């Protein structure tokens, strides 16, 4: 396995309280890092990666994620390419430096706001990038 569980998984995550107990949740960067490697015929976790990026792109420590990926950064580049196709309006919210570091073009804003919805619906009719109606 490329994404090994280590101290950073438990030391750096946000603190949450469950039933009065303070616990640390897994940091989003570690979760994305591990899910990028799940590309099997019967299971692919990239949809989870897209949803995490969509919900938390502003709070992701992209430098840390890229450091964890190291030579496997092309996996993130591939996921971001697909994400920018699925949600071109939202992909532009990811800081430009991330795109530059991965040598990807910065996504152009879509002239059609319904484009993200239509493209996501091609892959799955569940409401990926929108609230349920």
Question: What is the predicted function of each stretch?
Answer:
Residues 1-7:
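Conserved catalytic core of two-metal-ion nucleotidyltransferases
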Residues 15-24, 28-133:
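The feature captures the alpha-helical scaffold/lid subdomain characteristic of nucleotidyltransferase
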């Amino acid at each position: 396995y490329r994404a090994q569980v280590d101290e950073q998984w438990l030391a750096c995550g946000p603190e949450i309280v469950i039933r009065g107990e303070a616990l640390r949740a897994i940091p989003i960067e570690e979760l994305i890092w591990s899910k990028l490697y799940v590309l099997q015929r019967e299971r692919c976790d990239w949809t989870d990666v897209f949803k995490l990026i969509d919900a938390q792109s502003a709070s992701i420590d992209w430098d840390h994620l890229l450091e964890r990926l190291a030579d496997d950064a092309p996996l993130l580049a591939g996921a971001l390419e697909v994400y920018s196709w699925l949600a071109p309006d939202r992909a532009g919210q990811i800081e430009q430096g991330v795109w530059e570091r991965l040598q990807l073009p910065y996504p152009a804003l879509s002239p059609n706001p319904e484009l993200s919805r239509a493209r996501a619906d091609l892959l799955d009719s569940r409401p990926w990038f929108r609230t349920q109606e």
